[in-house]
């Protein structure tokens, strides 16, 4: 694979509307060349015998079964609350906005 040129980097910078100095053109050309070589190397991997997967680990169901269990009654849940009304926790108002009914 041919190395990316300074002119190509300058063109990409113009398209991206990036201000790039002459020194940065050389640096970016080298860095982009390394990245493109790595991408090309990944593309060379033969994966025809590997089945497509959605996960790298072959687990099918790692969640527990849903089980109905007993829970607190409204009275038990509200028993430690400083204030309650209509089976709900009552808290101080924090906004001074009028509530439209």
UniProtKB/Swiss-Prot annotation:
Its EC number is 6.3.5.-. Heterotrimer of A, B and C subunits. It comes from Salinispora tropica (strain ATCC BAA-916 / DSM 44818 / JCM 13857 / NBRC 105044 / CNB-440). It catalyses: L-glutamyl-tRNA(Gln) + L-glutamine + ATP + H2O = L-glutaminyl-tRNA(Gln) + L-glutamate + ADP + phosphate + H(+); L-aspartyl-tRNA(Asn) + L-glutamine + ATP + H2O = L-asparaginyl-tRNA(Asn) + L-glutamate + ADP + phosphate + 2 H(+). InterPro entries: Asp/Glu-ADT_sf_sub_c, GatC. This is Aspartyl/glutamyl-tRNA(Asn/Gln) amidotransferase subunit C. Belongs to the GatC family. It comes from the Bacteria. One of its GO terms (biological process) is regulation of translational fidelity. Pfam families: GatC. Allows the formation of correctly charged Asn-tRNA(Asn) or Gln-tRNA(Gln) through the transamidation of misacylated Asp-tRNA(Asn) or Glu-tRNA(Gln) in organisms which lack either or both of asparaginyl-tRNA or glutaminyl-tRNA synthetases. The reaction takes place in the presence of glutamine and ATP through an activated phospho-Asp-tRNA(Asn) or phospho-Glu-tRNA(Gln). Gene3D superfamilies: Glu-tRNAGln amidotransferase C subunit, N-terminal domain (1.10.20.60). The keyword ATP-binding applies. The keyword Ligase applies. Keywords: ATP-binding, Ligase, Nucleotide-binding, Protein biosynthesis. One of its GO terms (molecular function) is ATP binding.
